[in-house]
């Protein structure tokens, strides 16, 4: 098996879907390793726009088989709704090319209710979750009381475990705006439909062990990783290279490329430290020109300059072999472009490649910037590297040097599927 892994290098929303879509055209198998329907990205294919959340974007390729892996959490109503939406838009046969690991966990409506209650209790220190129930679902998984997808098929086991979860949360929160009987009734119907999609993951993957092109689609990003991100303002899964390997039982020697997706500036949704965030006209311009609204939540994304401290840290953990720089065209109309190159910590220490583990400390760092000249010309839809303005190429090559020579092999120049430069 030859495996390529696509990972977000910042706080998500980097544009991973487009490179995944492009690579999926040659892939036999495309896998999601972690996360749930809290993830979200958009792919423009022909004259149609597809929004993906829990489903792998390899579904756009008619020859690619897709797997939702063991590290994910699956909201079953969203799975069927998203699948129906894709088929209505013309992705015929998508339902025949998607499978779910029996070891993935079930994200319930109960979890969404609890998510809202937990956020409310945090008050001013809330995490800023998507409200989709992802955190409570992973919490139940870690506490060994969660429900796996394979257990949906055993009605008695599913009912016993769901009633136990309901009772436990009622003991903690009191009365809930949740009806366990309604959810049990819904799953009585889903049980009839789910059987063909559920697979023993290891046996399933063994069928593809000789495939030269397997693609792993990361969700969220390194700075939202449960261990390495800006804890506690993170998601509840392992979003980096290690998480992908664990969730899909990957042989390390089979990995042929790890692709880090880097937005040409930085965005973040939700609460938490964001050192290079811009509370000024530059931030507003990045937000409006980049149309920075979350696919899943619709929330306005926070915007700032490219932060190379974050990128170096991400590179050190995920070991990228190549980079995809996205949304270069959003910077077309800036006279000058700033890049964060170092942090000055509250004690005066300067760091270029590490992120303080303490979120309170990270909130207080000062960013050291370099200023690069803008290019003030249109890069939208450019297909060849040599056709980019000189200063745009200088910006890309500066990033390569600062990230230890990892090549920027792909450059996004617009929202369309083919608005991408592929460098040799």
Curated annotation (Swiss-Prot):
One of its GO terms (cellular component) is cytoplasm. IMP binds at residues 13-16, 38-41, 130, 144, 220, 235, 299. GTP binds at residues 12-18, 40-42, 301, 327-329, 412-414. Binds 1 Mg(2+) ion per subunit. The active site is at 13 (proton acceptor), 41 (proton donor). Its EC number is 6.3.4.4. This is Adenylosuccinate synthetase. It comes from Aspergillus oryzae (strain ATCC 42149 / RIB 40) (Yellow koji mold). The lineage of its organism: Eukaryota, Fungi, Dikarya, Ascomycota, Pezizomycotina.
């Amino acid at each position: 098996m030859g495996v390529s892994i696509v990972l977000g290098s910042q706080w998500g929303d980097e544009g991973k879907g487009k490179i995944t879509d492009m690579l999926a055209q040659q892939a036999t198998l495309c896998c999601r390793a972690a996360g749930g329907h809290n993830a979200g990205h958009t792919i423009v294919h022909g004259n149609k726009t597809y929004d993906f959340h829990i489903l792998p974007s390899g579904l756009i390729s008619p020859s690619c088989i897709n797997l939702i892996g063991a590290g994910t959490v699956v909201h079953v109503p969203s799975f069927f709704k998203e699948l129906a939406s894709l088929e209505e838009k013309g992705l015929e046969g998508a339902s025949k090319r998607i499978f779910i690991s029996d070891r993935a966990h079930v994200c319930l409506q109960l979890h969404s209710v609890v998510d809202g209650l937990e956020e409310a209790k945090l008050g001013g220190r809330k995490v800023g979750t998507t409200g989709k129930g992802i955190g409570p679902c992973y919490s139940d998984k870690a506490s060994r009381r969660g429900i796996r997808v394979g257990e949906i098929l055993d009605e008695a086991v599913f009912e016993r475990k769901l009633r136990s979860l309901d009772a436990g949360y009622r003991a903690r929160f009191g009365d809930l705006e949740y009806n366990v009987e309604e959810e049990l009734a819904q799953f009585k119907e889903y049980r009839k439909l789910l059987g063909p999609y559920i697979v023993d993951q290891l046996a399933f993957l063994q069928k593809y062990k000789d495939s030269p092109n397997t693609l792993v689609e990361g969700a969220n990003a390194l700075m939202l990783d449960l261990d390495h991100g800006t804890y506690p303002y993170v998601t509840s899964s392992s979003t980096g290279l290690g998480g992908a390997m664990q969730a899909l039982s990957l042989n390390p020697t089979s990995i042929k490329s790890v692709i880090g997706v880097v937005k040409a500036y930085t965005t973040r949704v939700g609460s938490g430290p964001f050192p290079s965030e811009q509370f000024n006209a530059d931030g507003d311009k990045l937000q409006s020109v980049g149309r920075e609204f979350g696919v899943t939540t619709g929330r306005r994304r926070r915007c700032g300059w490219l932060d190379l401290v974050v990128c170096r840290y991400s590179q050190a953990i995920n070991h990228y072999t190549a980079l995809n720089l996205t949304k270069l065209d959003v910077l077309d109309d800036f006279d000058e472009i700033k890049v964060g190159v170092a942090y000055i910590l509250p004690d005066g220490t300067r760091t270029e490649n590490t992120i303080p583990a303490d979120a309170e400390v990270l909130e207080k760092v000062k960013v050291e910037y370099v200023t690069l000249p803008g290019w003030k010309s249109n890069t939208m839809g450019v297909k060849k590297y040599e056709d980019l303005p000189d200063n745009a190429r200088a910006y890309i090559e500066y990033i390569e040097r600062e990230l230890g020579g990892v090549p920027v092999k792909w450059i996004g120049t617009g929202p369309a599927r083919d608005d991408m430069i592929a460098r040799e």
